[in-house]
């Protein structure tokens, strides 16, 4: 259980230390570290991943006496988090079985997010104010012969995507195929104002049945 903030390096060292002793490391986050609207750099270090639930995190709510699972974590272009929540009351069920829940065979979850019709204005604004994140995205676009300022609303579909790859501390799985299948699915299917989101297993099964040539 981690109740208070700590450095990214210390979290990495502690996690690796436990794993080197043969332990499976599962962090439960105290109130100060609960996910809110945006994902912090430290919170990235507590993320886990499964094919059935995508990115997820465990939170411990001492006041309500529940263990909370936030799963199917995605981010929109404004950086806001979108996810589903499942709660497990204390004393109900076997704790080890609960912690294995994201990896167990189950009906694949899904949810939908309405697309932001003002996103082009937002991105132009971010570039005008030279926000580092969007300046980097613009630089990457230039290298591809693209310009973010010229994009129309449909060009930003899908607006909600999995957590970007980077310095995950608890995830050792190669996520390349997940990111690839995710993007390919929405390119292949008709653009929709209501974007439906699925776990990694869904996209894998989709392309297993519909091989992209």
Regions found by a protein language model. Give the residues of each.
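Catalytic cores of nucleic-acid endonucleases
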Residues: 3-59
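Non-catalytic C-terminal interaction segments of nucleic acid-processing enzymes
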Residues: 42-213
């Amino acid at each position: 259980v981690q109740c208070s903030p700590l450095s990214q390096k210390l979290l990495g060292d502690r996690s690796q230390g436990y794993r080197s002793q043969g332990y499976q490391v599962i962090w439960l986050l105290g109130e100060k570290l609960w996910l809110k609207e945006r994902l912090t750099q430290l919170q990235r270090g507590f993320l886990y991943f499964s094919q059935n639930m995508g990115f997820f995190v465990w939170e411990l709510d001492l006041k309500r006496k529940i263990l909370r699972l936030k799963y199917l974590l995605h981010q929109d272009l404004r950086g806001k988090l979108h996810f589903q929540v499942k709660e497990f009351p204390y004393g109900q069920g076997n704790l080890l079985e609960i912690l294995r829940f994201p990896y167990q065979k189950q009906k694949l979850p899904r949810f939908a997010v309405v697309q932001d019709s003002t996103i082009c204005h937002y991105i132009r604004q971010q570039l005008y104010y030279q926000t580092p994140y969007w300046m980097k995205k613009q630089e990457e676009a230039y290298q591809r012969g693209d310009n973010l300022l010229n994009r129309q609303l449909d060009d930003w579909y899908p607006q909600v995507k999995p957590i970007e790859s980077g310095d995950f501390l608890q995830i050792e799985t190669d996520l390349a195929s997940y990111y690839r299948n995710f993007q390919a699915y929405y390119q292949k299917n008709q653009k929709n104002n209501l974007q439906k989101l699925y776990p990694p297993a869904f996209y894998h099964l989709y392309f297993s049945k519909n091989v992209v040539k």
